[in-house]
Amino acid sequence: MEKPVPGNPNGHGCGHNLLGAGALGAAIVIKEYLKATGKSGTVIFYGCPGEEGGAAKAFFARENEWAKLDAALTWHPDDVNQVVTGSSMACIQKEYIFSGVASHAAGAPEQGRSALDAAELMNIGVQFLREHMGKNASVHYAFTDAGGVSPNVVQSKAKVLYMIREATVQDAVKLEARVDKIAQGAALMTETQLSTRFIDGTANPLPLKTMEQLLYKNFVQVALPEYTEEEWAYAAALKNTYESAGLPSYAAKFDENIAQTVDKATDGGKRALNDFLMPMYHSSVTLPGSTDVGDVSWQTPTGQINCATAPSMVPGHSWQMVSAGTTGIAHKGMLTAAKVLAAAAIDIID
């Protein structure tokens, strides 16, 4: 089951290969409804590339595109059927670029100014910063250029990409400023030059209970997928390839009554597929992770659902999610999303 597929087939570690098609399906249904009834209304299908890190919706927001709308609806593949509630982290992506002087690491080390040392010192400084960050803050990094592959060279260039998250945009910007100072200090210590490249930023979503209730009402009315024996068997086999503990859905983590309901429906989390609708739940809790849907919500009322496209409690950004993303399970979840979004949009129009 875990093996590379030749070529460049469809698939994504977070199910994003299903996102656009599900939303497009909803747009087509709404269009046909307007044509059939003669009612007036405008439905716009937005293609938003780079949602995994390019934050296209934030660039739309910069141009005030979402402010033109009466409402915005979207969905995200998941292992459960539920209405999304609460918020998530504001996030800033930024690359720190250090430039130094190359030299022979043994023959003339004193002539070198190591950009790699600067990047590593920056990372160490950020580790010490963690103790003094807010409880909602998190910082992640990855080397995008470590300078080279020869250890006997003082590396003259290094790049490290940071994701800086906080509960609000304002707090994320403040944390970014502290990370900037650490980078500046690392450059000062190593006598290297620092430059930065802002990549993108996303805002924390604004939860809207009224929109959540509208989506849930329509979710209840849409028939959820029925799976074949083969799909159940596939899901069970895939579920056996990863560790899973606890119960699916964040609602079960915060609400004891919902936890009891989910525990019963999933046989204590052992069930391979979540073929039911999670109970209605509204929260203002800030969850980990980030989404550019947040930028939309600051300009127009926004609602989002999750639909089951993979086995229960499948880890995100995993080969298991990729594998599930081209199956009938995923396609059924995608079509469910189209139906729920279309029905909710029609209610808004009416």
State where each predicted segment sits.
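Active-site alpha-helical elements of protease catalytic centers
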Residues: 13-30
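Short secondary-structure boundary/capping elements
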Residues: 22-25, 52, 288
